[in-house]
Amino acid sequence: MTSTGDSPSIQSLRDLREASCGPVGGAAEGSPTVTNDLSENVILTSLDDLHNWARLSSLWPLLYGTACCFIEFAALLGSRFDFDRFGLVPRSSPRQADLLIVAGTVTMKMGPALVRLYEQMPEPKYVIAMGACTITGGMFSADSTTAVRGVDKLIPVDLYLPGCPPRPEAIFDAVIKLRKKVGNESVSDRRQLKQTHRYCTIDHAMVPVEPIVTGAYLRAETQVAALSPGVGVPMAAPEQTESAEPVSSGASS
């Protein structure tokens, strides 16, 4: 490429850039300096980085608390933990939220309402399953006929937060991990890889299993052997005493 007229050549521009990046006269050799060159004061970024930075810095959660796990999340609203530093602004409408925090037991009757709230949230949206009851059903998963064995059977879950209940510090750790996930996403990839099977569209079918608590432990061999000495002891008949004065059944005339 040849330069025409008064336009500077590529080599002259490179020399000017190297000269501007060098130390200023009178400054110590190797000390950091601020240059006046425009190329040294411009930060280059991408659309994905800018978009992800804006989203991870302003997550608006929709709090869906159904049990005791929500009490631990309510502690974050106070001044001790101050979760506002992460840009979390609780919303009461799913149309204004992009993060759904499910804390507590999800029942069959609340399942359709939860799915409806999730579908009303705009894309991109994320879900945090908080607590053992939300993830696996918890202590209600043994013999309950109304508890859902994991909220991921109804809606997709981006992050699982185990605990019974999780501490507020664990909730902060979950939010930080979710921010890292948001920061590594791409707008084009999310549009192309939009899942169509994100949640179950059929009714939650429960598999019949044998009950765990049946009361049969009272009829176990070891229990019978332990109770046999006491069972074989004859019981003494209760003592009967007769009253000397008859009991009147009515008022005397």
From Swiss-Prot:
[4Fe-4S] cluster binds at residues 68-69, 133, 164. It is a peripheral membrane protein. NDH-1 shuttles electrons from an unknown electron donor, via FMN and iron-sulfur (Fe-S) centers, to quinones in the respiratory and/or the photosynthetic chain. The immediate electron acceptor for the enzyme in this species is believed to be plastoquinone. Couples the redox reaction to proton translocation, and thus conserves the redox energy in a proton gradient. Cyanobacterial NDH-1 also plays a role in inorganic carbon-concentration. Belongs to the complex I 20 kDa subunit family. It comes from Synechococcus sp. (strain CC9311). InterPro entries: NADH_UbQ_OxRdtase-like_20kDa, NADH_UQ_OxRdtase_20Kd_su. The gene is ndhK. GO terms for biological process: aerobic respiration; electron transport coupled proton transport; photosynthesis, light reaction. GO terms for molecular function: 4 iron, 4 sulfur cluster binding; iron ion binding; NADH dehydrogenase (ubiquinone) activity; quinone binding. PANTHER family: NADH DEHYDROGENASE, NADH DEHYDROGENASE [UBIQUINONE] IRON-SULFUR PROTEIN 7, MITOCHONDRIAL. GO terms for cellular component: plasma membrane-derived thylakoid membrane; respiratory chain complex I. It holds the Pfam family Oxidored_q6. This is NAD(P)H-quinone oxidoreductase subunit K. Keywords: 4Fe-4S, Iron, Iron-sulfur, Membrane, Metal-binding, NAD, NADP, Plastoquinone, Quinone, Thylakoid, Translocase, Transport. NDH-1 can be composed of about 15 different subunits; different subcomplexes with different compositions have been identified which probably have different functions. Its cofactor is [4Fe-4S] cluster. The keyword NADP applies. Binds 1 [4Fe-4S] cluster. It comes from the Bacteria. The keyword Metal-binding applies. Its EC number is 7.1.1.-. It is found in: Cellular thylakoid membrane. It is an enzyme of class 7 (translocase). It catalyses: a plastoquinone + NADH + (n+1) H(+)(in) = a plastoquinol + NAD(+) + n H(+)(out); a plastoquinone + NADPH + (n+1) H(+)(in) = a plastoquinol + NADP(+) + n H(+)(out).
